[in-house]
Amino acid sequence: PIADYEELARWWDKYAGKRPLFIGEDVERTVKYADPQNPNSHQLNAKRRLHNTLPHVNGTVLWYAKNFCDNIGNYATAMRNGYWKYPALQPMMPFIDDKAPKKPKHVKPIWTDDGYVLFWNAPRGKKWNDVAVKYVVYRFDKGEHINTEDASKIVAITPKTFYKLPYEDGKKKYVYAITSLDRMSNESRVAKKKVKL
């Protein structure tokens, strides 16, 4: 017998055992069958709403990847334009490590042959779980509250210790905030720099 998706998802959520839960989702079935609550729509929106109500669901694993790339039922378009519109950090694994690395140091914009570039130094780390492996670059308007929970402010997630700034005429003021990520996606405090672009 075929199990009900919502029933399974709630069961998985209940017995997640304080571990990250990623629900496998068949792209083709999701767009092939109607939402039982809304027969005029396929199941994508209903599944997203359900996932958002379940506290242990950290994401979705899609299969087959080809179906996503082929944009069956406009699935990929809906994800790119709505649910996955902004960059995201990997889910944290606090049961392995929950200590954040130190923040980047010496953040400084410099003119180079390639344009205006924001540079920073990697923080020191003694053990594998203290070392910064990536950096998140956020951009905020001058005077705007620095909120690293707002993914719409992410302009880059990079292993590099620099970011090429989109210079225009030097009249617009921004604050760039850079954080360090370790291998478990623990995020450091913010290192800030005001720039004029």
Describe the role of every protein-language-model region:
Residues T60, W120, V137, I178:
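Hydrophobic, well-ordered secondary-structure elements that form the walls
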Residues P1-I2, A9-F95:
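Substrate-binding cleft of secreted/luminal carbohydrate-active enzymes
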